[in-house]
Amino acid sequence: MDYSFEPEIEKLNVSCIINGVVDNAVLELQEDNDCRIILTVGNNTYSSGAEHFWGALTELRKQLEEHNIKLLCQGCCMNVYPSPMILDMGDARKAYKMKLGYTAKMEDLVFIFDPCDPDDYASIEEQDRFYDEWKRTPRILEKPNDSAKTDANLKDEHKTKPKKNWFQFWKHKSTGKQTG
């Protein structure tokens, strides 16, 4: 009995810039033991494989950069990078779109093969440099304006709440007479 199976192939239409001209291309994503990417641009085919799709995309980009081809997808943007947990726990099809000074959140996740604007493209080196800078930069959580409470508001709220005398509460509780 043969238990082998053909890996499922997902095809995506993407754009590339080749020597300054935008061209259409097809990405094929395959996942079995490893993650493989095959890019067909005109009559040329480039392929790569790795433990996860982020690694395969990085290997593919190395080949493309040698041929002056820019793949226009989110995974090629300067401020897009996966967290170590994404790399360790899955196929790394998503990564965070990061902003210097801010913590990456779930709503910042993007599909790395979604299209990007040509102006957002960055080389692997530029992307790695941004990620290193993001890691070194102190970060804060962005709070939504409508529900954020300032420290002053929290202090005022604390002052207006009646304080219970817990000693008095427990003293009367033991006698069965509650006051609190």
Task: Please provide the spans of the model-predicted regions.
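Long, contiguous binding/interaction regions
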Residues: 2-10, 14-35, 46-50, 54, ...
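Secondary-structure transition/turn motif
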Residues: 39-44
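Polybasic, Ser/Thr-rich amphipathic helices
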Residues: 161-178
